[in-house]
C-alpha cells in the first residue's frame, strides 16, 4: 500500500466565481469544504489525506488576469502563487477556481509531476457544475496530474475513472491501476518532501 501522505491544499476563488455565488462567502466556503470532503473519499484508496489549508476570495478584483486561455491563466496563477501567496501562507498545492469559460471544452488544467514545487504545484478549475461530485472529481483530476498521473489510455481504459481524458457523469469514481502506478512512481522517483510532513 502507498505510504500515508498529506496535502495542504489552498483554494483561491476568483472574482467571477465570487460574483456567481452572489458574493456569499459563507455559501462558497460550505461548497468548497463539501468538495474537499469528496476529494478525500476519492483519495483514500491512495492513503492520501487532503487538508484544506485556506480559502482566499478575490472579492474586490482578480489579482491576476483570468482569461479564456486556460494555459495563460494557469501560467499567471503559478507565478502569483510563488511570488505572492507563498510569501503569506504555507501550502503544498493551490487551485484557482473560476466561473470563466475557457476555450474549447477545457474545465481544468494542471502541470504534471509538480507537487511541492513552489511555482508549478497548481491547478486551474472551471466551476462548471452545480453537482458537488462532478466538481470534486474535476479538482481531484487536476490534483492527480500534479501527483504524476497521466490520462488513462489504452490498457487502462475505465470510463468512470478519475483520470479519464473526458469527465464522465457516471457515479463510480476511482483511480485506475495506471493512475496508482503513476502515483507510486512519482513518490519513488521525485520524493516530494511536502507530502511526507
Curated annotation (Swiss-Prot):
InterPro entries tied to this protein: MetalloPept_cat_dom_sf, Peptidase_M12B, Reprolysin_adamalysin
Enzyme Commission number(s): 3.4.24.-
The protein's required cofactors: Zn(2+)
GO cellular component, one term: plasma membrane
Highest taxon listed in the record's lineage: Eukaryota
Subcellular location field: Secreted
Predominant location: secreted
GO molecular function: calcium ion binding; metalloendopeptidase activity; toxin activity; zinc ion binding
Tissue specificity annotation: Expressed by the venom gland.
Positions contributing to Zn(2+) binding: 141, 145, 151
Active-site residues from the entry: 142
A GO biological process held by the record: proteolysis
Domain Peptidase M12B: 5-197
Intrachain S-S bonds: 116-194, 156-178, 158-161
Similarity field: Belongs to the venom metalloproteinase (M12B) family. P-I subfamily.
Subunit structure: Monomer.
Function: This protein is an alkaline zinc metalloprotease from snake venom that possesses weak hemorrhagic activity.
Protein name per Swiss-Prot or TrEMBL: Snake venom metalloproteinase acutolysin-C
Species per Swiss-Prot/TrEMBL record: Deinagkistrodon acutus
Amino acid at each position: 500500500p502507498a505510504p500515508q501522505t498529506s496535502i495542504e491544499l489552498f483554494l483561491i476563488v476568483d472574482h467571477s466565481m465570487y460574483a456567481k455565488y452572489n458574493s456569499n462567502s459563507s455559501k462558497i466556503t460550505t461548497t468548497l469544504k463539501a468538495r474537499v470532503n469528496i476529494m478525500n473519499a476519492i483519495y483514500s484508496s491512495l492513503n492520501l489525506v487532503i487538508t484544506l489549508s485556506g480559502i482566499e476570495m478575490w472579492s474586490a478584483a482578480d489579482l491576476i488576469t483570468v482569461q479564456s486561455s486556460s494555459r495563460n491563466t494557469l501560467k499567471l496563477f503559478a507565478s502569483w502563487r510563488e511570488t505572492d501567496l507563498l510569501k503569506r501562507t504555507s501550502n503544498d498545492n493551490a487551485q484557482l477556481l473560476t466561473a470563466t469559460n475557457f476555450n474549447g471544452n477545457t474545465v481544468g488544467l494542471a502541470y504534471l509531476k509538480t507537487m511541492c514545487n513552489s511555482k508549478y504545484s497548481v491547478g486551474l478549475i472551471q466551476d462548471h457544475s452545480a453537482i458537488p461530485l462532478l466538481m470534486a472529481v474535476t479538482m481531484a483530476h487536476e490534483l492527480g496530474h500534479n501527483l504524476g498521473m497521466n490520462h488513462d489510455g489504452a490498457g487502462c481504459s475505465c470510463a468512470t475513472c478519475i483520470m479519464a481524458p473526458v469527465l464522465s457523469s457516471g457515479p463510480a469514481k476511482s483511480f485506475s491501476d495506471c493512475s496508482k502506478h503513476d502515483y507510486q512512481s512519482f513518490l519513488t522517483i521525485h520524493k516530494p518532501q511536502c507530502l511526507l510532513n
